[in-house]
Amino acid sequence: MTTPSILTLHPGEMTFADLRRVWLAPTPVTLSGDCAAAIEASAATVQAIVARGEPAYGINTGFGKLARTQIATHELEHLQRNLILSHAVGTGQDLDDNVARLVLLMKAASLARGYSGVRRVVIDTLLAMLNAGIVPCIPSKGSVGASGDLAPLAHMTLAMLGEGDARVNGVRKPAREALAAAGIAPIALAAKEGLALINGTQVSTALALNGLFLAERLLQAATVAGALSVDAAKGSDAPFDPRVHTVRGQAGQIATAAVYRGLLAGSAIRRSHLVGDTRVQDPYSLRCQPQVMGACLDLIRQAGATLLTEANAVTDNPLVYADAGEVISGGNFHAEPVAFAADMLALAIAEIGALSERRIALLIDSTLSGLPPFLVEQPGLNSGFMIAHVTAAALASENKSLAHPASVDSLPTSANQEDHVSMATFAGRRLAEMAGNTATIVGIEALAAAQGIDFHRPLATSDALARAHTCIRSRVAYYGEDRLFAPDIEAARRLVLDGDLGDSCRAHLADLALA
């Protein structure tokens, strides 16, 4: 097995490639050497405030509504430990390992920028856990996205203290046991360190990044499936003419139309009906793909830009400015930008699925597609894709409800001290469910379109789409007669979610990537 190359963490400068590496697989991470001075100066500033005894929020005071209560110096370590124990009140299923790895990475990156007042050992412990494959068990529910992701990040911090549970290679065990096996000492929190660890938007951002990377795969797979559907239905490629899109000027639409042209170029199926086709215009689900999918691309990229900024951000409170010896209370923990970005991704994911469902409906309707009813030989004896489409319709409808913006809601907490919140954590968390729904829809479309291509033989589709067809048929055989279909749909869903369908046409999809 090849050892993965080490990722050098440059706080404030992480790229999508960096984040995607950690999201995809365990990756060894080391901290850039130029962070040390800022970290040490920030920690020294906090210790100086403690030594002077002057009140500073989160350093020697209570928290939230209890901020006016000053804590004696000899109680400060106890204060930080109490903070973690009292705030670890999350519920629900644990975050998946890939999301939890992003949380650890982004928390280390934020603290290492030197505005949080923590010692180097705190950052080193986070990275040591990441490198040892120790994934804290972080419940996915319990955060309102301000003041930071308090409850889930408290569960992350529990593992650093040797409390709570963690997973190693998928096996859940006591965190203290996992740390000991890796030779990592549990930490004792100094002044402000507990607050710095739990104040921040890293959980919301990790969930939203998970949705972002899945949305990128969905967009690419649905574009391939949509192009296959055009050929399967003997649709026209004229709507993808660059002149149509240039006069509108929408960047995503222009890029997406070019992708469709590349995917369909050279199709013998298309050449077979260039002359004598009495259809003047295709239905919108075929003809308007660049307009819809291009808008989704623009939305995904806009959300991505926000999330990349947030992944590199300092979202702690209060912030420590070592150069001035000051501590300033602010509100960078408020995850409204993340909530908005996640809501935008939800719209894109829902719309990708909605358009795909409409193309399935077109393909199974012989009056629209010219293909056998429900895409099966001997219709009547066989039901073919009839109920597979019903499943797609059910999931498309479900996504429409899940796409309701989470950010429009707010409930005051902490005795009205925290009186407006973002709901960013739920905004990000529901994206995985929505992506799974859309992947199933697009997978069903891919099967339906491949079936349509098969019916046109000996006419062949384009070289690019032939590779997609081969990819589909490598997992799911031609549907000659009714059979148990659920395993085939699951296999197609995995082709979409794992990125294999998009990868089959990778050379044509560069303009649909985030970076």
Curated annotation (Swiss-Prot):
Is-annotated flag, keyword Cytoplasm? yes
Cross-link 5-imidazolinone (Ala-Gly) placement: A146-G148
Q: Which CDD domains match?
A: PAL-HAL (cd00332)
Q: In which pathway does it act?
A: Amino-acid degradation; L-histidine degradation into L-glutamate; N-formimidoyl-L-glutamate from L-histidine: step 1/3
Q: Where in the cell is it found?
A: Cytoplasm
Q: What are the record keywords, sorted?
A: Cytoplasm, Histidine metabolism, Lyase
Q: Which GO terms describe its cellular component?
A: cytoplasm
Molecular functions per Gene Ontology: histidine ammonia-lyase activity
Describe the reaction catalysed, as an equation.
L-histidine = trans-urocanate + NH4(+)
Q: Which residues carry this modification: 2,3-didehydroalanine (Ser)?
A: S147
Tell me its EC number(s), please: 4.3.1.3
Single Gene Ontology BP term? L-histidine catabolic process to glutamate and formate
Q: How is it modified after translation?
A: Contains an active site 4-methylidene-imidazol-5-one (MIO), which is formed autocatalytically by cyclization and dehydration of residues Ala-Ser-Gly.
Q: Which NCBIfam families match?
A: hutH (TIGR01225), PRK09367.1 (NF006871)
The text of the family note is: Belongs to the PAL/histidase family.
Name assigned to this protein = Histidine ammonia-lyase
